[in-house]
């Protein structure tokens, strides 16, 4: 149903956000921005 689709989409978005946050953190830590 629609709710399961939304949940899947939410998980996907959360993964992408977490990945980009980790990337920017690594960038700041290593100074390789």
From Swiss-Prot:
Alphabetical list of InterPro entries matching this protein: Antimicrobial_frog_2
Location within or outside the cell: Secreted
One GO location term (cellular component): extracellular region
Tissue expr: Expressed by the skin glands.
Amino-acid biosynthesis among keywords: no
A biological process term (GO) from this entry: defense response to bacterium
Cystine crosslinks: 27-33
Chief place of localization: secreted
Keywords in alphabetical order: Amphibian defense peptide, Antibiotic, Antimicrobial, Disulfide bond, Secreted
One Pfam family hit: Antimicrobial_2
Recorded family membership: Belongs to the frog skin active peptide (FSAP) family. Brevinin subfamily.
Job of this protein: Has antibacterial activity.
Protein name: Brevinin-2LT
């Amino acid at each position: 149903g629609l709710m399961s689709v939304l949940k899947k989409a939410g998980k996907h978005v959360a993964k992408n956000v977490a990945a980009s946050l980790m990337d920017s953190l690594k960038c700041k830590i290593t100074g390789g921005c």
